[in-house]
Amino acid sequence: MKNNIINLAQDLIRRPSISPADQGCQQVIAERLAQLGFTLEWLPFGDTLNLWAKHGSGSPVVAFAGHTDVVPVGDETQWTYPPFEARIVDNMLYGRGAADMKGSLSALVVAAEEFVKANPNHTGTVALLITSDEEAAAKDGTVKVVETLMARGEPIHYCVVGEPSSGKVLGDVIKNGRRGSITGELYIEGVQGHVAYPHLAENPVHTSLNFLTELTTYQWDNGNEFFPPTSLQIANIKAGTGSNNVIPGELYVQFNLRYCTEVTDEIIKNKVAEMLAKHQLKHRISWNLSGQPFLAGNGELVKATVQAVENVTKITPRLDTSGGTSDGRFIALMGAEVVEFGPLNATIHKVNECVSVEDLGKCGEVYYHILERLLKS
């Protein structure tokens, strides 16, 4: 299995699929799956290519999800090995996307292939959801596929997302949920004027200080068994013209909350509105909800994944919900139990991104064992 995974990973890495470009990656995968009797459905939206592939029928539907797009390489001269050469050095596979996530995507594909070969009459459905729009806008990828499936009443019961979840060693972390993410774009209005005549102006920076203190120190919740407390961070703040003699007429504040299941986006919006009213600030605000929090808890997929990781790596993984958002947030909206498991994330989005060849082989074994537990005939 390992050699097949590495060969496929190298083929995919050599295709410079900067998001949302796919550069033929999904076609390579589709041709392999078609030979094994998978039904293929292409779901293009905008400039994004999506593939929905299935083998078998009925329940449960166990889906593997991944993406073929990668982030830009940056200054290519800083790379020790060319980012799209897919070179193996000292048992490490180097290249953009090696860890995030062409390596684990290859492991997902090969695991599905091997399972179907060994169990042609398996119960339920093996599915793969592959997109080229995860790293950039995430507007025409998994979210659109999920909308399509939901519109026709087609379920996903369990989903393994192959994101690089591991920290220090393969298998030390399984993501069994993710926090929600919401961003506020706030404009506090004042009156512009000369700094020598403050009585003729209103400085929005000064009038907002008490509000900003309350906003940044407010305790939203205490977290729970699975999530840390909700956190808020100011990401950007701007006022003034750049001149030292002009009182600004407007203050711009952009802030983001990573929130747990103890609060909702509506609770957050209402509380911020309450604070703004309390401090009598003339303002306008807009919100961008990137994703709701989701949690798989200790369900069947979590149990199957933990058991598979223990069998393959001989270590007991820690269940964790920290970190950024992933496409799992969209799939969870279907009522699916979602976990993320994949290789080490130490080099993702970095120069000299790389992944252990041995770890990719073990990832494939873990994915295979998950299918065995949930679908074996």
UniProtKB/Swiss-Prot annotation:
Residues annotated for Zn(2+) 1 binding in this entry: 67, 100, 163
Active site per database record: 69, 134
Organism domain of life: Bacteria
Reactions performed catalytically: N-succinyl-(2S,6S)-2,6-diaminopimelate + H2O = (2S,6S)-2,6-diaminopimelate + succinate
E.C. designation(s): 3.5.1.18
Pathway where it operates: Amino-acid biosynthesis; L-lysine biosynthesis via DAP pathway; LL-2,6-diaminopimelate from (S)-tetrahydrodipicolinate (succinylase route): step 3/3
Function (record text): Catalyzes the hydrolysis of N-succinyl-L,L-diaminopimelic acid (SDAP), forming succinate and LL-2,6-diaminopimelate (DAP), an intermediate involved in the bacterial biosynthesis of lysine and meso-diaminopimelic acid, an essential component of bacterial cell walls.
Cofactor note: Binds 2 Zn(2+) or Co(2+) ions per subunit.
Coiled-coil residues: none
InterPro entries per the UniProt record, alphabetical: ArgE/DapE_CS, Bact_exopeptidase_dim_dom, DapE_proteobac, Peptidase_M20, Peptidase_M20_dimer, Peptidase_M20A
Name the UniProt record assigns to this protein: Succinyl-diaminopimelate desuccinylase
An annotated Gene Ontology molecular function: acetylornithine deacetylase activity
Names of required cofactors: Zn(2+); Co(2+)
PROSITE patterns noted in UniProt: ARGE_DAPE_CPG2_1
CDD domains: M20_DapE_proteobac (cd03891)
Subunit structure: Homodimer.
GO biological process: diaminopimelate biosynthetic process; L-arginine biosynthetic process; lysine biosynthetic process via diaminopimelate
Family: Belongs to the peptidase M20A family. DapE subfamily.
Keywords: Amino-acid biosynthesis, Cobalt, Diaminopimelate biosynthesis, Hydrolase, Lysine biosynthesis, Metal-binding, Zinc
Amino-acid biosynthesis is among the record's keywords: yes
Keyword Translocase: no
Ligand binding (Zn(2+) 2): 100, 135, 349
